[in-house]
Amino acid sequence: EAGYKDVDGDGLRENKDGSKLQINFAARTRDAANESLVQQYLLWWKEIGLDVQLYTGRTIESNNFYEKVQADDPEIDVFSAGWGVGYDPNPANLFGETAKFNFSRYVNEEGTNIIKKISSTEAFDEAKNVEFYKEWQAYAKDKAFLIPTLVGDSVTAVNKRVKYYDTSIATKDSKAQLYQLEVTSDTPAK
């Protein structure tokens, strides 16, 4: 529909003017599972007729990766990166006009106005805050300026004989601190 068609029959789409379309993809080096996922992305893109190549021919060590992304390397067309919102999900920290970690560089007036509402004193009202976040979610879904592909999760096993353990221990969100931990028995609970 956008005019990118396979005009020479090689199974890959060309630019609208008929020239070769190649997309450079940057991804961080992490673990074997990530390397497999990156290769799978390349296969899926090829299946829909896109010639996507790894920028530098391989995944990139994390520090170098983020240096290149933050520098807006013109050779990178699309990238896969990780991020988290921490305890405050305010999108201003990742998608604001001056946000240091706005790696997508996507900013427009509509999104900025929603972020301003989320960051306003009006958002102290819980119902308004929920309304503003729902508006942001609808906006982000509609614009699709980034596409989440993975959600991190962790499981922490703690024996029942340990009291006051908290997975966020030693963070400002924790209600417990390390000095409060107790072990109630010499033998593990079963």
Question: What are the residue ranges of the model-derived segments?
Answer:
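Detector for C-terminal structural segments
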Residues: 1, 33-43, 67-190
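Ligand/substrate-recognition segments at binding pockets and active sites
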Residues: 4-82
